[in-house]
């Protein structure tokens, strides 16, 4: 048996959904639109430090809230890029669109940003041990109470795939009130795909 996703495990306790809407009809279309919007934003702004995309819907409006460590990259000069994002999303949803960008204050303890950073370093042929240890040190320095980082695949170009992980501090996965952030990223290297998993214990 594998481990349960810490975010899904804590839904409605300390976490909430990233798509906040309900539909009796057209639920499937709405779900596909949400996936398409997130895919477009993550692909278009790979280097903008996108942490999460919250989508809220009403009858005549789709509101997209982008959490990013570098909001200026997404907004562009005088908000020019925001208008482009609105147009692209409006084409997908055929509805009025509102886009807001929120800055991530402590990117060093955001699991999504940590996993993406490690994956990007692995693609640039940085040693996986060095990338993992550097991420752990900066995370704990910023006030996280515990962190675990795991890398799986042909690490360092080895013939046989393996998993290596490092853990510092506490990580109470079965304590539901514990605020644990989790993320998964993939590094596409010349040896194959390396999976990166990150768990961050922020506190209760």
Curated annotation (Swiss-Prot):
The record places domain KH type-2 at 37-105
Q: Which residues form a coiled coil?
A: none
Q: Which GO terms describe its molecular function?
A: mRNA binding; rRNA binding; structural constituent of ribosome
Its quaternary structure?
Answer: Part of the 30S ribosomal subunit. Forms a tight complex with proteins S10 and S14.
Tell me, in a sentence or two, what this protein's role is.
Answer: Binds the lower part of the 30S subunit head. Binds mRNA in the 70S ribosome, positioning it for translation.
- Name the InterPro entries for this protein: KH_dom, KH_dom-like_a/b, KH_dom_type_2, KH_sf_prok-type, Ribosomal_S3_C_sf, Ribosomal_uS3_bac-typ, Ribosomal_uS3_C, Ribosomal_uS3_CS
Q: What is this protein called?
A: Small ribosomal subunit protein uS3
Q: Which NCBIfam families match?
A: rpsC_bact
Task: List the keywords (alphabetical).
Answer: Ribonucleoprotein, Ribosomal protein, RNA-binding, rRNA-binding
Q: Which PROSITE patterns match?
A: KH_TYPE_2 (PS50823), RIBOSOMAL_S3 (PS00548)
Is the keyword Transmembrane helix assigned to this protein?
A: no
Q: Which GO terms describe its biological process?
A: translation
What GO cellular component is one of the record's annotations? cytosolic small ribosomal subunit
Regarding protein family, the annotation reads: Belongs to the universal ribosomal protein uS3 family.
Q: Does the keyword RNA-binding apply?
A: yes
């Amino acid at each position: 048996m594998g481990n349960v996703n810490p975010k899904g495990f804590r839904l409605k306790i300390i976490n909430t959904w990233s798509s906040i809407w309900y539909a009796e009809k057209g639920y499937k279309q709405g779900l596909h639109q949400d996936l398409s919007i997130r895919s477009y934003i993550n692909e278009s702004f790979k280097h903008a430090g996108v942490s999460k995309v919250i989508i809220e819907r009403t009858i005549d409006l789709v509101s997209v809230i982008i959490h990013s460590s570098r909001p200026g990259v997404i907004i562009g000069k005088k908000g020019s890029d925001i208008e482009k994002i609105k147009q692209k999303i409006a084409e997908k949803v055929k509805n009025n669109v509102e886009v807001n960008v929120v800055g991530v204050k402590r990117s060093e303890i955001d699991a999504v940003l940590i996993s993406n950073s490690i994956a990007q370093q692995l693609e640039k042929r940085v040693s996986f041990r060095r990338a993992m240890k550097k991420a752990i040190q900066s995370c704990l320095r910023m006030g996280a109470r515990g962190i675990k980082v795991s890398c799986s695949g042909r690490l360092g170009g080895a013939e046989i795939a393996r998993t290596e992980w490092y853990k510092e501090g506490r990580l109470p996965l079965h304590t539901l009130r514990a605020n644990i952030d989790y993320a998964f990223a993939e590094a596409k290297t010349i040896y194959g795909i390396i999976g990166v998993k990150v768990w961050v214990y922020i506190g209760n």
